[in-house]
Amino acid sequence: MFHRLLNKSKILACDDKSVNDYIINVKNLSFFYSKKKVIDNISFRVKFGEIITILGPNGGGKTTLIRILVGIYKNYVGLVEYAKDFTIGYLPQHFSVNSLIPMTVEYFLNSSYTNRKRKLGVGDVLKDVNIEKILDRQMSEISYGELQLVLLARCLMLNPDLIILDEPVSCMDINAKNSFYKLINKLISIYNLSVIMTSHDLHFVMSNSYRVICINKSVYCEGSPSEIVKNEKFLKMFSSYA
């Protein structure tokens, strides 16, 4: 699964002051695999229009947290509150294309949703994501960076309020990473989006995030990039950052 359409009003929606002006409010969240605790008492909020990056080591709970937020994992302990009537688009870290099934990029996008779910057509998002030139190519032949753009376009067809991306630039070169982050900033303005990303790219994170949350099972520190780089817990977790 590489996206998820969620109408959170059907799961949990609150009107009280605790979620006023916030799209997601997480309180005292914990999660266990069997008897092993992998998320430990995490709390944070996401405001409308923010770019939030979640940093942490491998095995620190980033992907588990993301899967809770998008509704894949439900047997958690704690509270996750959502604003009413909003849609989440989700891109996981890994997505594979079956090379034995011929499918052009254009066909893939057009066949992605029923008319009921689709809020925008392929033509509405092509120019914004800059994939017009690869519509006739096979999905199995495009590069990783191009695949991420196609999946992002597919996500935007839902006209989501929030997009969640798990390590979206992990296999891109420096130029591609820079272009992708610039695109995300542009899309926030065009589509009035909020964004949550996980990442290991500290330097790109610091220049492309409104807020950074560092986790290793629990939240170690949280704040703006300028605040985070001075935080002793951040410096201890990422001792190689300079």
Curated annotation (Swiss-Prot):
Its main location: membrane. ATP binds at G56, P57, N58, G59, G60, G61, K62, T63. It is an enzyme of class 7 (translocase). Residues 24-241 form the ABC transporter domain. Keywords: ATP-binding, Cell inner membrane, Cell membrane, Ion transport, Membrane, Nucleotide-binding, Translocase, Transport, Zinc, Zinc transport. It comes from Ehrlichia canis (strain Jake). This is Zinc import ATP-binding protein ZnuC. It is found in: Cell inner membrane. Pfam families: ABC_tran. SUPFAM superfamilies: P-loop containing nucleoside triphosphate hydrolases (SSF52540). GO terms for cellular component: plasma membrane. The keyword S-adenosyl-L-methionine does not apply. The complex is composed of two ATP-binding proteins (ZnuC), two transmembrane proteins (ZnuB) and a solute-binding protein (ZnuA). Belongs to the ABC transporter superfamily. Zinc importer (TC 3.A.1.15.5) family. Its EC number is 7.2.2.20. Gene3D superfamilies: P-loop containing nucleotide triphosphate hydrolases. GO terms for molecular function: ABC-type zinc transporter activity; ATP binding; ATP hydrolysis activity. InterPro entries: AAA+_ATPase (IPR003593), ABC_transporter-like_ATP-bd (IPR003439), ABC_transporter-like_CS (IPR017871), Metal_Ion_Import_ABC (IPR050153), P-loop_NTPase (IPR027417). It catalyses: Zn(2+)(out) + ATP(in) + H2O(in) = Zn(2+)(in) + ADP(in) + phosphate(in) + H(+)(in). Part of the ABC transporter complex ZnuABC involved in zinc import. Responsible for energy coupling to the transport system. It is a peripheral membrane protein.
